[in-house]
Amino acid sequence: MSFEQVVGEKENRLEFLTSTPPMLPRQVVTLAFLSKHLPSALMSAQLAASLCAESSGVSVVLVRLQPSERPPSFLDAYDEGRATAVDWAPSEVMLQGQFGMPSSLIRTETGFHLLTLNVHGETSSPENIASLVAQLRRQFRYVLVEALADETPTPGLLEFLVQSDLAYLFLQGTTEDVYHVDLLIRKLRPRCQKPSGCFKPILCLAEGEQANGFDLLIQRVATPVHMYVRQCPTAAAGKDPGAPGGLTSLFKADLRRLAREISGRLLGLALSSGAAKGFSHIGVIQVLEENGIEVDVVTGASIGAYIGSVWAYGHDGREMERLAREMEGRWRLWSVIDPVFPPRQGFLRGLALKRRLMRSIGTSRFADLQRPLRVVAGNLVTLERTVFASGEVATAVHASIAVPGICVPVTIDGETYIDGGVVDPVPVDILREMGVSRIIAVNAIPTPDRIRYSLQAEQELARAKAGRGDRARRLFRKVVPLEQQLNYFARGNLFEIVMRSVHGAQVRLAEASCGLADVALRPDICDDRWLDCRNPGRFIALGRDVAERHLEEIKALVARKEPNHEREHTPRPMAAVA
């Protein structure tokens, strides 16, 4: 399309062009590929197709930016005989001086539209890019912009990122790519008023490839890795997606998760602290699995982090119950007790519990987990909340379960951490910050009213038993209170006082966090015996019960449709999209 054609129809489109496009959530998303070894065209097309599948009936356009010196085919290595409509899209919109929407767009078999733009060096001004984005906003609910990032980010790429509501920065685990993402974010910060969380690094790992510490490096120099794309094919392998082993189910699932984030369909699960009461999380997970409800992201604090890590690793609810029941019995608790002497920072190291966790998940890192996980801990020095999303999972969970005054604080990379339940007992807001729009929160921390009810019931039961039983045994326990003198875990002793004090600080925080969730599950736990690990089945049953009672509400949340913001397309030839 020529510049003269654009000018010729300018008057006819004046009202259309000057109207303000609706600002919809996550409407314009830039897919910036920082590595030339990634199959950018394949990944963006797969993501666009997944977005169409997740948002049926909603219009999606993939805008493919290519330097003007390239031939029309974006995938250079495709043979002309095997190329599809996606590969040989007409490049009739030129990014120079003025924009004109093409008279027709290619609609792919998977439902999205494809528009290829030739980019002429430095001629793509901010005004022109803003004009294009405004036109696309009017016509499509979702606009995906695919761009290859050079070693030095071009002004055009930076402007597309500034105009975007969200940007995924795809990179590989190399020092060069880490440098590129750091440079890109540093150049964006002065120009963009959006929060830095809008620019999300996506680490792409080939089949069998490990993060090898690059997740930690990215977090230090830029921002934490948002998500991972695993079993990612190379650029060469991506030329033939139909080849055996070309696209794995895990690769598709990871891209589908990104599409669910864009479409506002991500489902998150926030698991609270609560010590032994946290076994109720397992019952909730079992009900979700039995009803085919797929959770995309998990966050947890303290025991919630422990259980969330086991589930994110790949163990299902039944296997988790089996692992929990290994703690049944009067003396099983001592298998995770590792005293410290002298108890200068705490009475327990917490390493025994960490070793028990590693029996289930090994030395896995966050990049190895089947679903994204966020672990919460408190920084003892700065008193701020820390969210672990990279590194070794067991180490992060060890920090999250270090109850202050009982367990020795955990030091990681020179920083000292304590129990995550102290700073964020039900980490719902972390899910919101990640872009999760549908959240289920499980709060296993009993409220004061429930605790009072439990105490009254115990008193009534004690009075009923007062006239019967072994009077000699009761008299002996009263005269020689060995339980109170020797058992530091007994009610009214040191550990109990510390835990109840922590619990008192958590109650209001937990309830406030539940108010941010779409569905809040509160198992009917009345007693406050934080170390009652001898009967995990009881808490699991309570978790199942509350999940089953709210099952219809959960299903309605999963099936909830986002508001339809589609506009009726104008019949004008320059603005209409076929």
Give the positions of each predicted feature:
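Helix-rich "cap/lid" substructures immediately adjacent to catalytic or cofactor-binding pockets
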Residues: 246-298
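Phosphate-binding loop that captures ATP/GTP phosphates
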Residues: 51-118, 133, 324
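Catalytic nucleophile loop
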Residues: 294-313
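Walker A/P-loop phosphate-binding motif and the immediately C-terminal alpha-helix
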Residues: 20-75, 131, 136, 303
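Extreme N-terminal, non-catalytic leader segments
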Residues: 1-37, 244-266
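Non-catalytic peripheral regions of patatin-like phospholipases
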Residues: 204-207, 211-250, 317-356, 360, ...
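A short alpha-helix-loop-beta-strand transition element characteristic
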Residues: 361-372
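Conserved catalytic-core segment of NTP-binding enzymes
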Residues: 131-132, 137-143, 147-227, 440, ...
